[in-house]
């Protein structure tokens, strides 16, 4: 690809931009993060053993956001999670930056915080020095422990004797045979360690028996690729008149869209106060959980049921994006500012990419009688970030389409998690991708939290199914079919699964606002990637991921109900998630509601997924459904792209 000069084709928010607070929903600035840490550190209960899980904006009430006028004073408050290095438990604090005080504190004595980035980085060296782990490696022919690569995983909650009441991490290992080569081609099978993150001790080394370490290399870095295909001719994305969007204090406007871009350590990208042409669509949208269940019960692989958002926090794992590769075109970058365990400011430069893309044909019609044609091209605004969680990359894309649709796409790439087998004997739960190297069948199941506000906060939830009319007097030719709508008016009624047989879909409607046809304005959820979970609901992993049992859930808005697997779900028993929220069976008709959509990827591993996996994608769309009185893009000017030309004229 052709990469243009950074100074011409990209812009990153300046330090002054990052320090200016222009909107109540704007993420905390570096100065605010540091100030919050200082306020907490000077409070008597918190001392040298205190660490920070999260420091993030305490989002103001909706009425505050709705009534805000630019230039008005902005009250700033933070939500903080702190924990001790010595004891179990998490304390949730609310901190006023205006008053320099802690305004609220709540103890969660059995909770464990997310595993922190600093802990992950320390675990490898710690495990490599443990005598039992060294002995296990030696039994496999490894004498140089510097070649051993250790990936920490969350330990889950499996009631293993000796693990109760601890804060644990479980590890898998590989061997790197030479500098920079792909160590995932050399799994150290059957050797795992369990680490207590409070006492920093290896409480157990599990050795299930040695399998020869595969030695064939499978590399992806350019220095190892000796035979390369002929380069493709460049495609340049240029906007000679500049971009059509504007970013100020996180507030983004483009065409008829306006919204605020946020970011935190747990969810990564968050979107707020989403409006189209001044009409509200959603108050908040983000990806709030993902669980990755693996299908193998062999050795220590039964533990592979990781919640990348709730147990790790993908925001801290965001990449600094590279112009011309991660993002192509004329780019606006945003830096993000998070906290370290010690309360210092951690800045990830260019973590968010904003740009426009041509999106193909929007609409067209040729009147063959008059030989007249009208054509309009589509365009979309893209807001994205890419997070690396160990072996996998998760690329999050929010698309805002010119026709009023909102789309989320998750692209998964990186390297499959590998294990070893005897060559040619992968077993029933895996596929061999290299002699002696397997990838286990697994799933990536995601949950988006969509705090809808379709023309306001008073919304209802409607299910639509299509049925064939029974043959008979009303259907004499057997061709009749129709759509039936049902208002689901309580939380338990709205816990639903997809049904391809009836082409089921769901709408969020505002019963108080109607279109010209007299029907409620609405947005439709296009649930295109529903998956069937295979983990038993009654298993340890199934209880902790009960949200995957339905494809949609709808709850009455509660600001404390933020995550479908629970607020503190590291080592959780499954309580405190959305399955518990809906037991209240609150009314969800003509009120403030939250739509939770569960979708994902079913991934039987392919040979083509190794040594590095081409992107596979999943996602959903929110599309206007009677929100407008007609095609909202009928007013687009007719334009012809003058830069386009015939291929033969371009010298090919």
Question: Which role fits each region the language model picked out?
Answer:
Residues 24-66, 116-155:
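Short, non-transmembrane alpha-helical segments in secretory-pathway proteins
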Residues 2-13, 35, 97-115, 138-139, ...:
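Extended effector regions of multi-domain proteins
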Residues 87-89, 93-121, 125-129, 133, ...:
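Hydrophobic or amphipathic alpha-helical targeting/insertion segments
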Residues 47-97, 144-196, 243, 255-257, ...:
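Exposed beta-strand-loop-beta-strand "reactive/processing" segments of non-cytosolic proteins
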């Amino acid at each position: 690809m052709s990469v243009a000069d950074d100074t011409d084709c990209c812009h990153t928010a300046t330090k002054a931009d990052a320090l200016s607070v222009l909107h109540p929903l704007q993420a905390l600035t570096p100065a605010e993060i540091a100030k919050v840490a200082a306020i907490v550190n000077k409070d008597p209960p918190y001392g040298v053993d205190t660490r920070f899980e999260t420091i993030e904006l305490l989002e103001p009430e909706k009425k505050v956001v709705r009534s805000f006028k630019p230039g008005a004073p902005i009250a700033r408050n933070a939500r903080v999670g702190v924990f001790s290095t010595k004891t179990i438990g998490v304390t949730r604090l609310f901190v006023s930056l205006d008053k320099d005080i802690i305004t609220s504190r709540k103890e969660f004595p059995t909770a464990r915080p997310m595993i922190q980035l600093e802990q992950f980085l320390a675990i490898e060296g710690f495990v490599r020095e443990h005598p039992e782990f060294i002995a296990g490696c030696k039994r496999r022919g490894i004498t140089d422990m510097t070649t051993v690569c250790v990936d920490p995983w969350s330990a889950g909650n499996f009631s293993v004797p000796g693990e109760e009441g601890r804060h644990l991490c479980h590890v898998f290992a590989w061997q790197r045979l030479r500098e920079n080569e792909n160590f995932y081609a050399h799994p150290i099978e059957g050797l795992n360690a369990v680490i207590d993150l409070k006492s920093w001790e290896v409480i157990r080394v599990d050795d299930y028996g040695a399998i020869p370490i595969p030695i064939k290399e499978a590399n992806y870095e350019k220095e190892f690729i000796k035979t390369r295909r002929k380069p493709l001719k460049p495609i340049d994305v240029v906007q000679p008149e500049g971009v059509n969007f504007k970013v100020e204090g996180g507030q983004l406007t483009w065409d008829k869209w306006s919204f605020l871009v946020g970011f935190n350590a747990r969810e990564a990208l968050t979107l707020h106060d989403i409006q189209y042409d001044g009409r509200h669509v959603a108050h908040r949208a983000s990806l709030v959980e993902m669980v990755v269940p693996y299908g193998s019960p062999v050795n220590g692989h039964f533990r592979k049921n990781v919640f990348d958002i709730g147990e790790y926090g993908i925001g801290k794992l965001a990449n600094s994006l590279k112009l011309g590769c991660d993002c192509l075109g004329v780019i606006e970058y945003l830096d993000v500012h998070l906290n370290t365990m010690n309360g210092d400011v951690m800045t990830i430069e260019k973590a968010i990419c904003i740009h426009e893309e041509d999106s193909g044909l929007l609409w067209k019609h040729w009147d063959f009688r008059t030989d007249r044609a009208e054509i309009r091209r589509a365009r979309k605004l893209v807001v994205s970030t890419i997070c690396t969680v160990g072996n996998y990359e998760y690329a999050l894309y929010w698309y805002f389409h010119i026709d009023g649709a909102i789309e989320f796409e998750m692209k998964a790439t990186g390297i499959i998690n590998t294990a070893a087998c005897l060559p040619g004997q992968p077993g029933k739960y895996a596929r061999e991708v290299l002699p002696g190297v397997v990838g286990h069948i697994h799933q990536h199941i995601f949950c988006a939290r969509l705090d809808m506000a379709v023309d306001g906060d008073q919304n209802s939830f409607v299910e639509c199914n299509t049925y064939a009319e029974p043959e008979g007097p009303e259907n004499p030719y057997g061709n009749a079919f129709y759509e039936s709508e049902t208002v689901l008016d309580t939380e338990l009624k709205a816990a639903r699964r997809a049904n391809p047989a009836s082409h089921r879909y769901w709408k969020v409607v505002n019963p108080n606002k109607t279109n010209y046809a007299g029907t409620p304005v609405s947005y439709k959820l296009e649930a295109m990637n529903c998956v069937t979970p295979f983990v038993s609901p009654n298993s340890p992993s199934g209880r902790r991921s009960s949200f995957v049992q339905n494809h949609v859930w709808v709850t009455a808005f509660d600001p404390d109900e933020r995550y479908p697997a629970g607020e503190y779900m590291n080592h959780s028993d499954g309580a405190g998630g959305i399955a518990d929220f809906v037991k209240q069976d609150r009314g969800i008709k003509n009120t403030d509601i939250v739509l939770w959509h569960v979708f994902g990827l079913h991934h039987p591993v392919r040979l083509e997924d190794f040594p590095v996996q081409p992107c596979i994608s999943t996602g959903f769309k929110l599309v206007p459904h009677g929100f407008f009185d007609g095609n909202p893009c009928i007013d687009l000017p007719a334009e012809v792209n003058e830069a386009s030309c015939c291929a033969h004229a371009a010298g090919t």
